[in-house]
């Protein structure tokens, strides 16, 4: 099931990356992020997916951020034996430091619980990866 969620996330990332380039700050990436976020919210992955995880309330609770739906994409899957999370935030000059600070806090919380987590940036995007596949996802995103 972890592989299914990971494969879905990669598929969504690949679909979005065909539209533009994060490193070049291509304006089409805004459209790609919006599309990816919408698909993540609409996707049904069964019992593995926590249905309340992709809404603004979870974002506020986990990251202490209030963002418009077009400014983030978030997948969070939790079971008693598995915790996976991938969040991508679109940043601008006004909110860059705030989002990065909140993302660092989220990574630190996961590390305190012994869960692998990584924080990274790519162009005007900040990403947070938490869980077993975090290292693999980090390597993938750094290659974009």
What would you call each of these model-derived segments?
Residues 98-106, 138-144:
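Short amphipathic alpha-helices in soluble, non-transmembrane regions
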Residues 18-21:
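Bacterial signal peptide processing site
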Residues 84-93, 125-130:
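Second-shell loop/turn segments in exported
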Residues 1-4, 8:
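Positively charged n-region of N-terminal signal peptides that target proteins for export
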Residues 25-45:
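Post-signal peptide N-terminal segment of mature Sec-exported envelope proteins
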Residues 111-144:
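A short, solvent-exposed beta-edge/loop patch
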Residues 46-84, 95-99, 116:
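Short, compositionally biased low-complexity segments enriched in polar/charged residues
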Residues 13-16:
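C-terminal motif of bacterial Sec signal peptides marking the signal peptidase cleavage site
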